[in-house]
Swiss-Prot record:
InterPro entries, alphabetized: DASH_Dad4
Function: Component of the DASH complex that connects microtubules with kinetochores and couples microtubule depolymerisation to chromosome movement; it is involved in retrieving kinetochores to the spindle poles before their re-orientation on the spindle in early mitosis and allows microtubule depolymerization to pull chromosomes apart and resist detachment during anaphase.
Entry protein name: DASH complex subunit DAD4
Compartments where located: Nucleus; Cytoplasm, Cytoskeleton, Spindle; Chromosome, Centromere, Kinetochore
Gene this chain is encoded by: DAD4
Keywords, ordered alphabetically: Cell cycle, Cell division, Centromere, Chromosome, Cytoplasm, Cytoskeleton, Kinetochore, Microtubule, Mitosis, Nucleus
Oligomer and partners: Component of the DASH complex consisting of ASK1, DAD1, DAD2, DAD3, DAD4, DAM1, DUO1, HSK3, SPC19 and SPC34, with a stoichiometry of one copy of each subunit per complex. Multiple DASH complexes oligomerize to form a ring that encircles spindle microtubules and organizes the rod-like NDC80 complexes of the outer kinetochore. DASH complex oligomerization strengthens microtubule attachments. On cytoplasmic microtubules, DASH complexes appear to form patches instead of rings.
Principal location: nucleus
One BP term from GO: attachment of spindle microtubules to kinetochore
A GO cellular component entry from the record: DASH complex
UniProt similarity note: Belongs to the DASH complex DAD4 family.
Phylogenetic lineage: Eukaryota, Fungi, Dikarya, Ascomycota, Pezizomycotina
Amino acid sequence: MESPHEHQQNLLLSRIITNVEKLNEAIMVMNKTLQEINIQNMNIELVAQMFKNYQSNVLFHLEATDNLKDPA
């Protein structure tokens, strides 16, 4: 015959296993979302670097052609 403590422990263990499975699913969803965010951040970083390089090239060109004027 099974002891009441063993039965109670089995119920608790079952609840723990269920909760850990739910937690794992939530973490997997969060990791997928973070991966998508990181991909978008890489795209934003690339565009920002392109604009920075463009600004540097424009400044170089304006200085080289003596067309750089002080801001009004």
